[in-house]
């Protein structure tokens, strides 16, 4: 077995997450075969009515500039069937911190790499938000050998089929230490079984393998795969009814430009008046967590999801006013400091960033109670109430102007500094 050790240490006085040593391993083929024969997927279902959609499907492709995706044969055709989010931004480089930031956590803790990580169990995730309303969730990872597989990749050699660093919730001990949660991380065979048997969850994250997502091929290949994957699903009423389907990318392929990524929404929950149009509202990966919280009345994690803009029609329905962001000086291509840094592209620092605990946040439902309890009395490390992440200490995304005009005519504005 191949082993790599990485120690995550904490600042002594603020040990709010348990330090531990993580082990990157490749189970033997015999161990994998045994697990395949015994570990069964877990497919909970729920029917919690949302404000504007009842199911959310998130599909990620890899490493492509906006213009390159827009020039493909199939992706613009699909986008015209729904709503193109013209101003949607990834939040850093490389890939793994975007996966971590977007779905489970709302932060990266300094992650500037695609390493093997295990994040302590008292760090809250989006799964904890869903649990407050008993909303069923699931991940579908193409090439995963069995539900809840925790190895770094599969197979160990050859083409990159499944890789751990594209599997957001497997990074968290609060998921891997829970047998039911772990079995909700499944493969594509389980996806089609769940589809056929009408037991899809209300939230799902879908990761193609490294060939189909374009990482080891190109955008033409991944665009063709997307067309083949989605075309049949879009004809399935069970899949599309009251469903919002997002197709997006983890990051741009060019690191020196702004991290604006090609993103569009499909499905029966896209408002009729928005079909075939473009939305120029400023969004980030964090906007997804914030919009899910708004849709289902969930609290915030108190991190960068707190101040993120909401999907425009959701904001209109709730009365929240999104910020306009001047992106002329915005790049979103660097990671803030933290304990998961390799000290290469961000600064390693042993202390874990403290979330905000007293903000109402854009979703309007306050902060998750366990987050408030864990960090009670501490001051937030960053200004998590802004519509994009920035850090004065490292100089990331500073000097960016943002503003909004409230319904009473009052103008609120600021500059990240």
Swiss-Prot record:
EC number: 3.1.3.2
Location(s) in or outside the cell: Secreted
Gene3D superfamilies the UniProt entry points to: Alkaline Phosphatase, subunit A
One Pfam short name: Phosphoesterase
Disulfide bond positions: none
Any single biological process term in GO: phospholipid catabolic process
Signal peptide range in chain numbering: 1-19
Catalytic-site annotation from UniProt: 216
Name of this chain's protein: Acid phosphatase
């Amino acid at each position: 077995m191949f082993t790599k050790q990485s120690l995550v240490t904490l600042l002594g006085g603020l040990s709010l997450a348990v330090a531990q040593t993580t082990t990157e391993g490749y189970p033997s083929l015999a161990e994998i075969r045994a697990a395949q024969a015994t570990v069964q997927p877990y497919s909970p279902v729920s029917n919690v009515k949302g404000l504007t959609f009842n199911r959310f499907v998130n599909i990620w492709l890899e490493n492509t500039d906006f213009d390159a995706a827009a020039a493909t044969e199939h992706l613009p055709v699909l986008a015209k069937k729904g709503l193109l989010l013209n101003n949607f931004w990834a939040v850093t480089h490389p890939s793994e911190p975007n996966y971590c930031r977007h779905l489970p956590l709302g932060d990266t803790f300094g992650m500037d790499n695609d390493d093997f990580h295990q994040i302590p169990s008292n760090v809250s995730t989006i799964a904890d938000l869903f649990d407050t309303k008993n909303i069923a969730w699931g991940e579908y990872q193409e090439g995963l050998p069995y539900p809840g597989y925790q190895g770094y990749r599969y197979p160990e050699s050859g083409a990159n089929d499944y890789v751990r660093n594209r599997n957001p919730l497997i990074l968290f001990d609060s998921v891997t230490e829970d047998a039911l949660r772990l079995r909700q991380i499944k493969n594509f065979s389980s996806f089609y079984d769940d589809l056929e048997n009408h037991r899809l969850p209300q939230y799902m994250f879908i990761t193609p393998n490294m060939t189909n997502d374009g990482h080891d091929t190109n955008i033409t290949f991944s665009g063709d795969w997307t067309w083949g994957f989605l075309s049949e699903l879009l004809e399935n009423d069970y899949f599309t009814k009251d469903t919002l389907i997002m197709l997006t990318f983890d990051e741009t392929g060019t690191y020196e430009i702004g991290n604006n990524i090609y993103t569009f929404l499909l499905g029966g929950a896209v408002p009729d008046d928005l079909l075939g149009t473009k939305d120029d509202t400023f969004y980030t990966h964090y906007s997804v967590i914030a919009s899910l919280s708004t849709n289902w009345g969930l609290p915030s994690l108190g991190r960068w999801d707190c101040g993120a803009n909401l999907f425009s029609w959701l904001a209109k329905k709730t009365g929240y006013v999104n910020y306009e962001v001047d992106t002329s000086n915005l790049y979103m291509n660097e990671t803030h400091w933290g304990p998961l840094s390799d000290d290469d592209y961000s600064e390693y620092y042993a202390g874990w960033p403290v979330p905000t605990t007293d903000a109402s946040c854009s979703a309007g439902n306050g902060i998750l109670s366990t987050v408030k309890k864990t960090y009670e009395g501490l001051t937030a490390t960053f200004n998590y109430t802004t519509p994009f992440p920035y850090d004065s200490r490292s100089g990331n995304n500073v000097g960016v102007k943002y503003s909004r005009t409230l319904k009473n005519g009052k103008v609120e504005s600021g500059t990240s500094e």
